């Protein structure tokens, strides 16, 4: 559906800036695709290259089989009708009602009043604004304003919806409702949605795949589940850790003395990660039953990512050192990830 091939963007001037550096991505039809990065990472420039609001310095932008970089100005205007966009700050016309804001792009396209009404009435119903059609932006909450922006973007019946930090100006509860709306639109209309954000929680909630961008370069890309369960780059680990932490809380670390070596009187401190059906594995019970170990659980939790359960445990394997080693060997035979963090004082 969307293919970016070797996209680069350079802003020339006294302070030359390489905003994007040789980026290649493929976004399949019907996906919700997230691009995450900190301020200045290049994510806004990248998403604006998809609809050519920013023309790349080099590379190809192929949307639904058409390379937008090769189109004339008039051809590009036609192609953009199939690419909707919503913005962080809504960009509504204060002098127009909800209905007239949504109708505005269709008026520019020359549709009749009857055609416009037929087009946008069901859209206003989908976004939950049927009872607000005569309200002005000043009479709306932030979430309602964003719903107007979404309705306006959908009015042209796009195949692609671009979301430029669409929830970053909203409170958490409103953000949740907007994300639910985007999921509903994706499922109901089969829209391909590309969103940029600096919030990993947004990625976790609705995205099928995610790309992590930093300094104009894609650091890491994969399914949301893959990236959450196995982040490779430090930046990605920081993003994931802001939402799902599998590290021992600082409060707990302050009460234990961690050793690098397994010395007398210490026991292994082990991090365990389970995905999918592996969360049903009775690991702790197995260690107690098979090896007569006293397993102390210091930290644990289960999250759900892309409808898949992801569990985490940090445990101490107290007991006879030989039995503890056998327990570690046993853990490594299971369909779970494990890591010995270090060694702590064993309980008596």
Per-region residue spans from a language model:
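Conserved ABC ATPase "signature" region
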Residues: 66-67, 103, 107, 114-131
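A short, proline-enriched helix->beta-strand linker immediately N-terminal to the Walker B motif
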Residues: 155-159
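A short, surface-exposed alpha-helical micro-motif characterized by mixed small hydrophobic
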Residues: 203-205
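Helix-to-loop junction immediately C-terminal to a conserved catalytic motif
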Residues: 51
């Amino acid at each position: 559906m969307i293919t970016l091939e070797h996209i680069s963007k350079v802003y020339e001037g006294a302070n030359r800036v390489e905003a994007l550096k040789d980026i290649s991505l493929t976004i399949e039809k019907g996906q919700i695709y997230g691009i995450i990065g900190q301020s200045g990472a290049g994510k806004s420039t990248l998403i604006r290259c998809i609809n050519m609001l920013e023309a790349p310095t080099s590379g190809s932008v192929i949307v639904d089989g058409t390379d937008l970089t090769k189109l004339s100005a008039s051809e590009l205007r036609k192609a953009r009708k199939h690419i909707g966009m919503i913005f962080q700050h809504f960009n509504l016309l204060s002098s127009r009602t909800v209905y007239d804001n949504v109708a505005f792009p269709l008026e520019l396209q020359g549709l009749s009043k009857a055609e416009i009404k037929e087009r946008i009435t069901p859209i206003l119903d989908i976004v939950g604004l049927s009872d607000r059609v005569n309200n002005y932006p000043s009479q709306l909450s932030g979430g309602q304003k964003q719903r107007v922006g979404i309705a306006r973007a959908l009015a042209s019946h796009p195949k692609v919806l671009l979301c430029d930090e669409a929830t970053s100006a909203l409170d958490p509860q409103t953000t949740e409702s907007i994300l639910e709306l985007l999921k509903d639109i994706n499922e109901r209309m089969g829209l391909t949605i590309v969103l940029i954000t600096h919030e990993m929680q947004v990625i976790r909630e609705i995205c099928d795949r995610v790309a992590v961008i930093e300094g104009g370069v894609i650091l890491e890309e994969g399914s949301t589940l893959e990236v959450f369960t196995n982040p490779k780059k430090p930046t990605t680990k920081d993003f994931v850790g802001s939402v799902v932490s599998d590290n021992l809380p600082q409060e707990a670390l302050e009460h234990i003395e961690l050793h690098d070596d397994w010395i007398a009187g210490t026991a292994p401190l082990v991090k365990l990660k389970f995905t999918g059906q592996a969360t049903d594995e009775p690991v702790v019970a197995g260690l107690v039953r098979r090896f007569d170990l006293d397993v102390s659980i210091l930290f644990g939790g289960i999250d759900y990512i892309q409808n898949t359960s992801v569990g985490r445990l940090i445990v101490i394997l107290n007991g006879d050192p030989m039995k503890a080693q056998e327990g570690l060997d046993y853990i490594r035979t299971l369909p779970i990830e494990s890591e010995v963090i270090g060694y702590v004082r064993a309980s008596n």
